[in-house]
């Protein structure tokens, strides 16, 4: 008896029924070829469908309209709006803020991480510390930003495996003084637990391997203004402790934004750290009254 094969299960594929979204064409003709943030709106004004950024809003929006994989989002879209910025930095910062505040349906969700942890190295030991108890903007010798304690310990374990560091000396497992750990017998530990390596040498190897993960302390006394310009537009991004407080068209208006942030902004740090430390932007330290001579 021949078993009759069942018909293959049909799966919905947005690309298979893609049609160019003609209802959005009028918005494309008005979209500027400038840097900034764009928003796809549904019939609801309270919940955006998608928020994106680009150095050329018009070009990026056009690419969305021509992408079959985004047919589901495009069918729900009713209008497109945008906010122009002075450059790429402003677009990055504004996009991150709007996504976190408005939680668009088709964006990856960005939320404040209340369990944010890091590894702190001090006095020949390493431990996991939380952003709830330590100021990550100013505390020295922090390495890595992790979603929680478990992720921090896993990263430390991976580092130990790569560098043949001792789990016992790192606090990852119990160790008996003077006795070799189990990993030493497997040649996965260099022997700091049993005198084959000095504690100082072990610590220096740990320190060197962590360096690529170092969290940079906020290097200014207070808030700064980052100047970003293009023809017809200049913005001063006001930043303090790695948190973007907003943008103003002139330094005279900086006082309306300056404040000391509560907590550490992980998204702001990831966006701002490398550009600020590279020297590619003009940085202006703000006085207490925020007026510059």
From Swiss-Prot:
Function: Incises the DNA at the 3' side of a lesion during nucleotide excision repair. Incises the DNA farther away from the lesion than UvrC. Not able to incise the 5' site of a lesion. When a lesion remains because UvrC is not able to induce the 3' incision, Cho incises the DNA. Then UvrC makes the 5' incision. The combined action of Cho and UvrC broadens the substrate range of nucleotide excision repair.
GO cellular component: excinuclease repair complex
Protein name as annotated: Excinuclease cho
Enzyme class of the recorded protein, top EC level: hydrolase
Keyword line: DNA damage, DNA excision, DNA repair, Excision nuclease, Hydrolase, SOS response
Keyword DNA damage: yes
Every GIY-YIG domain range: 33-108
E.C. designation(s): 3.1.25.-
Gene that specifies this protein: cho
PANTHER family membership: EXCINUCLEASE CHO, UVRC/OXIDOREDUCTASE
An example Gene Ontology biological process: SOS response
Molecular function as annotated in GO: nuclease activity
Annotated organism of origin: Salmonella typhimurium (strain LT2 / SGSC1412 / ATCC 700720)
Gene3D superfamilies for this protein: GIY-YIG endonuclease (3.40.1440.10)
